[in-house]
Regions:
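Amphipathic alpha-helical packing segments from all-alpha helical-bundle domains
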Residues: 97-125, 129-134, 159-170
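Short linear capping/connector segments at secondary-structure termini
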Residues: 91-99, 149
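Amphipathic alpha-helical core segments of compact helical bundles
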Residues: 29, 136-140, 144
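Short, well-structured alpha-helical segments
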Residues: 21, 25, 72, 128-136
Length: 204
């Protein structure tokens, strides 16, 4: 079986999720004898399977819950799926191919489900889309840290992620109201003395 080694520069230079999905597709190709030209179909297969599996799990996690509790359950389930099925979740997290209706439909079903969960938390439109991007980044970030063991001294990734989700959920009402304030760096007069930057918040 072909072996791949990725350097830190490789990871930082490109999407790690895409690299993982591509690597798995290449392995499938080498085992099945498929030509490189059919790798798109393999990526499509992985993405569809990932979307459908994840959506089924999220529906089960949401059952009997509403609002913040449903959102937290969905977030924890997404993280567990990413840890247990890294290749499928990586394929599912990728943007759907615009020229593949089946792939796009599976993506839109999962996307609509997540927007519906966020709607119960009072978010819609651009606010919901932004919150969803934040949640995806939060989930994937913690998964990557856990897989690579990069959070030194952390006793429990489960507890750390749960606290992060609590903070995320607690901030949703402020985000939904549009009262988000930008933190803009402003050099201080004593920057040369090593005091760094001070920050001021300004309304949008």
């Amino acid at each position: 079986m072909k072996s791949h080694r990725f350097t830190v520069d490789d990871i930082l230079a490109t999407s790690w999720d895409r690299k993982l999905a591509t690597d798995l597709a290449e392995e499938i190709g080498s085992c099945t004898g498929e030509k490189l030209g059919t790798l798109f179909e393999m990526r499509r297969f992985l993405a569809l399977k990932g979307y459908r599996e994840l959506l089924q799990l999220l529906r089960g996690a949401r059952e009997g819950k509403n609002g913040d509790h449903a959102l937290a359950a969905v977030a924890h389930t997404t993280r567990r799926y990413a840890l247990e099925r890294p290749a499928l979740s990586a394929a599912a997290f990728r943007t759907a191919a615009v020229d593949c209706p089946e792939w796009r439909e599976a993506y839109e079903r999962l996307h609509a489900f997540m927007l519906d969960v966020l709607a119960e938390c009072g978010l819609s439109g651009e606010a919901a889309e932004n919150a969803l991007n934040m949640l995806r980044s939060l989930v994937r970030g913690y998964v990557l840290h856990e897989v690579m063991h990069t959070l030194v001294g952390l006793e429990s990734y489960d507890d750390a992620f749960d606290k992060a989700i609590q903070v995320f959920v607690a901030g949703l009402p402020l985000f939904a109201s549009g009262r988000i304030r930008h933190l803009q760096p402003r050099p201080t007069e004593t920057l040369e003395q090593g005091e760094g930057y001070s920050f001021r918040s300004e309304p949008t």
